[in-house]
């Protein structure tokens, strides 16, 4: 048994990287510590108990091909691109805690003349002329005899995309999930113009080896290393599923209203586990029957654009004489997801 492992992922797929993290965490040897370094391309990663619709602009994400990935730890929503270095420390050693991994990260940054410090429970900050700025957020998880500490380092993240996709629509959502805390952030390339993912990984590797006073061969991991492993495939299929990423959302309500030329419509949704379990429509239309039927048809379907659009298409077939129903369909699809 090797007491240390150092892993690098060649994949930018968040579902693969989070599946790999979870698979290794569950199957690692006793008295072992692992550092896993990875990146995701254009992804929003949300905490285990967060509401995807509340945290993210899901319509923009769907249109632009930005992935949603729900992790197994708690905490808030984060935007990932290739300007982000992701780290995961996993250990089954009895004396391990996240202060160990924080020290390794801080030592690695210090070797680049970047002086950072811990803020609160899970953040790293640096002091600037504008005050303290966040460069890293992380989450900690402990299960039985093993611990996991993972997070991000902001090297050269596209700040515009971060605010574009993490800024939720002005939907009237009431959620029981955890809401992300907006923090003032800064990219490390403002302090170190030549900083790169490879450079940071190399410094973290050195700090990792120095802390444990030993070295090991790095392991370069790609999807092809794991696609034949049944347990991993099961984890990967779960990680990328709609049910895990959206269906695990805590219960919430959604209210919509609009004024059409022919009347006003108010729509109230209750959503649980990603499914619409209550729907009620109020209208002053002179022909309320079609809308009343739609309200009933929406109950029991999943809360996503494809199923809602299909439901509306079937609904309008029953009322071909009412052209205004096409307006309702377009409004609903545009505003719900």
Swiss-Prot record:
Disulfide pattern: none
Organism superkingdom: Bacteria
Keywords: ATP-binding, Cytoplasm, Ligase, Nucleotide-binding
GO cellular component terms attached to this protein's record: cytosol
Catalytic activity: L-lysyl-[lipoyl-carrier protein] + (R)-lipoate + ATP = N(6)-[(R)-lipoyl]-L-lysyl-[lipoyl-carrier protein] + AMP + diphosphate + H(+)
InterPro entries, sorted: aa-tRNA-synth_II/BPL/LPL, BPL_LPL_catalytic, Lipoate_ligase_A, Lipoate_protein_ligase_C, LipoylTrfase_LipoateP_Ligase
Keyword ATP-binding annotated: yes
Its EC number(s): 6.3.1.20
CDD domains registered for this protein in UniProt: LplA (cd16443)
Positions with a binding annotation for (R)-lipoate: 134
GO molecular function annotations of the record: ATP binding; lipoate-protein ligase activity; lipoyltransferase activity
UniProt pathway: Protein modification; protein lipoylation via exogenous pathway; protein N(6)-(lipoyl)lysine from lipoate: step 1/2; Protein modification; protein lipoylation via exogenous pathway; protein N(6)-(lipoyl)lysine from lipoate: step 2/2
SUPFAM superfamilies: Class II aaRS and biotin synthetases, SufE/NifU
Residue span, BPL/LPL catalytic domain: 29-216
GO BP annotations, alphabetical order: protein modification process
Localization, UniProt: Cytoplasm
List of residues binding ATP: 71, 76-79, 134
Subunit composition and interactions: Monomer.
Note: In the transfer reaction, the free carboxyl group of lipoic acid is attached via an amide linkage to the epsilon-amino group of a specific lysine residue of lipoyl domains of lipoate-dependent enzymes.
HAMAP family: LplA (MF_01602)
Function (record text): Catalyzes both the ATP-dependent activation of exogenously supplied lipoate to lipoyl-AMP and the transfer of the activated lipoyl onto the lipoyl domains of lipoate-dependent enzymes.
Entries under PANTHER family matching the protein: LIPOATE-PROTEIN LIGASE, LIPOYLTRANSFERASE 1, MITOCHONDRIAL
Membership in a protein family: Belongs to the LplA family.
Protein's name according to its UniProt entry: Lipoate-protein ligase A
Organism encoding this protein: Blochmanniella floridana
Gene: lplA
């Amino acid at each position: 048994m090797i007491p240390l492992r150092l892993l690098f992922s060649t994949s930018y797929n968040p579902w693969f990287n989070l599946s790999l993290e979870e698979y290794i965490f569950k199957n690692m040897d006793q008295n072992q510590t692992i550092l896993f370094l990875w990146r995701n391309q254009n992804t929003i990663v949300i905490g285990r108990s967060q509401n995807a619709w509340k945290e993210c602009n899901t319509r923009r994400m769907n249109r632009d091909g930005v992935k949603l990935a729900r992790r197994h730890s708690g905490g808030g929503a984060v935007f990932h691109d290739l300007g982000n270095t992701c780290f995961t420390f996993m250990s089954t050693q009895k004396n391990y805690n996240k202060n160990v991994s924080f020290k390794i990260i801080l030592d690695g940054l210090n070797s680049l003349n970047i002086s950072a410090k811990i803020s609160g429970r899970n953040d790293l900050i640096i002091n600037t002329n504008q005050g303290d700025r966040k460069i890293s957020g992380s989450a900690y998880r402990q299960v039985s005899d093993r611990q996991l500490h993972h997070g991000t380092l902001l090297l050269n993240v596209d700040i515009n995309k971060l605010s574009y996709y993490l800024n939720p629509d002005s939907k009237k959502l009431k959620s029981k999930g955890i809401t992300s805390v907006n923090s003032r952030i800064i990219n490390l390339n403002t302090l170190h113009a030549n900083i790169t993912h490879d450079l940071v990984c190399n410094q973290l590797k050195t700090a990792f080896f120095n802390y444990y006073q030993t070295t090991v061969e790095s392991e370069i991991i790609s999807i092809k290393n794991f696609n034949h492993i049944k347990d991993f495939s099961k984890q990967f299929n779960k990680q990328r599923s709609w049910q895990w990423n959206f269906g695990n959302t805590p219960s919430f309500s959604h209210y919509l209203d609009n004024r059409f030329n022919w009347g006003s419509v108010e729509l109230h949704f209750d959503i649980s586990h990603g499914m619409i379990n209550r729907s009620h429509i109020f209208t002053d239309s002179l022909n309320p029957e079609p809308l009343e039927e739609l309200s009933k048809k929406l109950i029991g379907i999943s809360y996503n654009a494809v199923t809602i659009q299909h439901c509306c298409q079937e609904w309008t077939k029953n009322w071909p004489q009412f052209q205004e129903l096409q307006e309702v369909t377009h409004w609903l699809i545009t505003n719900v997801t």
